[in-house]
Amino acid sequence: MKALKQFLMRLARFLGLSAPPVALDQLADLAGKIEPRAKVEIPLAEPQKLILKDIAAGCRSSGSQRGETIVLFTGLQGTGKTIAAEILARDLGRDLYRVDSQRVISKYIGETEKNLNRLLTAAEEANVILLFDEADALFGKRSEIKDAHDRYANIEIGYLLQQLEGFKGVAILATNDEDNTDVSLRRRIRFVMKFPPG
């Protein structure tokens, strides 16, 4: 166990993270901390700034209620979704971690679920905000069942949605195309912010 902790500490340093508390040890291999910028210029229109303030107020009022702080940022690449997530994290006084979908998704049956469960548990304990960039990779539309693989993929998406709904923290899902996300996911989202092009 001591060797594992030392490995995680080295991994955290390699990823540019400070020495993490126990909960952050679990995050180190599935998400990377986004370091706050000294000054974040807000490239958002005034209505969007107001929406972001409303989202922050809603997150504060939700406290630690399960599933009450799922936020969807939707818009083309380069329209300000990540910067908006940084601003929201700063306003809430929490660290922001970008989830690496490549590390969460596994080709082995049951591993994706375990990884997401471990990630959400660690994020709750550490009280950090998770940014699922390109969320449709994890929470994409369920497909028509043609074989056992499709059936399992649909079951997996359902499980992931349940886990996210039970999460007692702030989860920001960013996607380039809202239509690529599962309909059940969209029903669970409390806040949606659209980022227009250009």
Where are these regions (language model features)?
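Compositionally biased, charge-rich terminal segments
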Residues: 1-6
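Conserved ASCE P-loop NTPase core motifs with emphasis on AAA+ ATPases
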Residues: 7-42, 46, 56-57, 136
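Walker A/P-loop NTP-binding motif of AAA+ ATPase domains
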Residues: 42-198
